[in-house]
Amino acid sequence: MCSSDLTAEKTKVLSAVRLPKDLAAHTARGQYAAGWQGSHEVVGYLDEKGINPASTTETYAAIRLDVDTRRWAGVPFYLRTGKRLGKRVTEIAVVFKRAPHLPFESTATKELGKNAIVIRVQPDEGVTMRFGAKVPGGTSMEVRDVSMDFGYGRSFTESSPEAYERLILDVLLGDPPLFPTTREVELSWQILDPIEEFWSTLGQPQPYRSGTWGPQEAVEMLARDGHRWRMP
């Protein structure tokens, strides 16, 4: 696969992204308030030096998107990003539906969650798989969540390059796959512009305490679809 193949696939995905019809129900925005970041007490966004006390700038955003392709039709994509959250982490979590029928009594699976594959991008690059396993021993059937974990740092002595190290190296080598093309940028803004325009009519974002995982709006957004955010 060469850089042009990767660019073509990224363009296909961006072209197939569909926004929710009800942006009020399937987007959330927030602005961090005072709280704790680790062991340090921190001020809220509006109290930061140089920030307009009436600023409506978001420091948190969450949205549901759909990808209108044969492979991903009907699969919701939930994206969230923010500042001053519980910790600094980037990951992709593929959470599977529970089977419509489990061949066990409900008491045997009451502690069983949904299977998931989590791709950790940073800071601890790796992959975690979560699935159900029978608790050994005993005469009764009990199934609980267990995890299998792979980490690059634990499996290899070589360290992965930092994000900007890789970008700078690609610039020197003239290798462009990680850089968005003009078309990719245009398609990205076609997704974001309607959301920004809608949010501009809402006034002040909902505050959330520093060190938490975002505003209550984001929790309610997923709850409407019968889901909840995964805690990294």
Residues covered by each model-derived region:
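Secretory/organelle targeting and membrane-embedding segments
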Residues: 4-232
